């Protein structure tokens, strides 16, 4: 009987990360160890107020990146200065969970981030105080699924990683063990 496929980062979490987190924070039970719950990708499409096709293009790109169909986000209220009416499509978002979440995270950390120009690591201060991490990407071209020739507009996106961690310190350690490229602690550099 063939074994079920397990994403690389899920296996790494089960085999190594739980053990390392338990040693560092002194958890009494493996279920206390923080874990990833979801990753939300959000792409705002401001040009959609003039051209409705821009949302469709963004949705197609997001589907290639995430591997699942995105939801179109709509304006909650009208804003005359932006020529925006309530209910107009203004972006797309995808929520990834379980295997797809781990697959995306693996591609994001090992393939996409190294392709960012002048990349010096992710901002270690982008935690929300509840153990969740948010970062932005300036262009969708860092993902290999997106062909440079087929892109009409370079768009950025938000990547939010939700965890069950109670504190930012626990979440930072969890993400560091997953391979998030946070720069070395700046306080240690100044002291040396």
UniProtKB/Swiss-Prot annotation:
Keywords: Ribonucleoprotein, Ribosomal protein, RNA-binding, rRNA-binding, tRNA-binding
Main function: This is one of the proteins that bind and probably mediate the attachment of the 5S RNA into the large ribosomal subunit, where it forms part of the central protuberance. In the 70S ribosome it contacts protein S13 of the 30S subunit (bridge B1b), connecting the 2 subunits; this bridge is implicated in subunit movement. Contacts the P site tRNA; the 5S rRNA and some of its associated proteins might help stabilize positioning of ribosome-bound tRNAs.
GO MF annotation terms: rRNA binding; structural constituent of ribosome; tRNA binding
Superkingdom of the organism of origin: Bacteria
Gene Ontology CC: one annotated term: ribosome
Name of the molecule in the record: Large ribosomal subunit protein uL5
UniProt xrefs under Pfam families: Ribosomal_L5, Ribosomal_L5_C
Keyword Ribosomal protein set for record: yes
Record's subunit section: Part of the 50S ribosomal subunit; part of the 5S rRNA/L5/L18/L25 subcomplex. Contacts the 5S rRNA and the P site tRNA. Forms a bridge to the 30S subunit in the 70S ribosome.
GO biological process, one term: translation
UniProt organism field: Zymomonas mobilis subsp. mobilis (strain ATCC 31821 / ZM4 / CP4)
Alphabetical list of PROSITE patterns matching this protein: RIBOSOMAL_L5 (PS00358)
Family per similarity comment: Belongs to the universal ribosomal protein uL5 family.
